[in-house]
Amino acid sequence: MSVISMKQLLEAGVHFGHQTRRWNPKMKRYIFTERNGIYIIDLQKTVKKVEEAFNVMRNIAAEGGDILFVGTKKQAQEAIKEEATRAGMYFVNQRWLGGTLTNFQTIQKRIKRLKDIERMQEDGTFDVLPKKEVVQLKKELERLEKFLGGIKDMKGLPSALFVVDPRKERIAVAEARKLNIPIIGIVDTNCDPDEIDHVIPANDDAIRAVKLLTSKMADAILEAKQGEETVTA
């Protein structure tokens, strides 16, 4: 049975690409036709590519690898957080902080600061500190949680990146490429597919499309984890 059906893709609007004037010619092989000034993505290719990406994600998870979900555009933020959390993986859904991968040690220092403030909040330290200081610490905690909350338990570099809109997330993509971390990505008609190891040609602007595809990637991870549980049980 295939991972995803044409009907599901159509209903979520996965086939709608960008306007024809905003395209990357390298995406030509994934385009079916042009309609009213918009490129229509070839969903038969998307079905195959979702299947490929699903298998890649499942295999990485089965080997105990961690996958970092990245999507900071408005349409992706919620799905990225929800599906990464459901799969027990990590995510960045606000702003990608430069050096998140290439300067991971520095990022870890900021995560340590985040955890230190959390501990202070939990162990009663806040109760004995001046009110003004507590207000500042809470603000700092809020900011750190916003940007680093999704990776605060990530001990090392991820085994792979799942990215929504590599054009928007070009810094994350560049960092992963520099470190030879494989990238699985939802790639629209205005993106460069050559930068992505496993391309899912799809509409990256519709919330339903992003949610559908991201949930399938989370399903792949959960399938691998359930397989492990069956083996150990």
Swiss-Prot record:
GO molecular function, one term: structural constituent of ribosome
Keywords for this protein: Ribonucleoprotein, Ribosomal protein
Primary gene name: rpsB
PANTHER family: 30S RIBOSOMAL PROTEIN S2 PROKARYOTIC AND ORGANELLAR, SMALL RIBOSOMAL SUBUNIT PROTEIN US2M
GO biological process: translation
Keyword Ribonucleoprotein: yes
InterPro entries recorded: Ribosomal_uS2 (IPR001865), Ribosomal_uS2_bac/mit/plastid (IPR005706), Ribosomal_uS2_CS (IPR018130), Ribosomal_uS2_flav_dom_sf (IPR023591)
Stored CDD domains: RPS2
Organism: Bacillus cytotoxicus (strain DSM 22905 / CIP 110041 / 391-98 / NVH 391-98)
One Gene Ontology term, aspect cellular component: cytosolic small ribosomal subunit
Any matching Pfam family: Ribosomal_S2
Family: Belongs to the universal ribosomal protein uS2 family.
Annotated protein name in UniProt: Small ribosomal subunit protein uS2
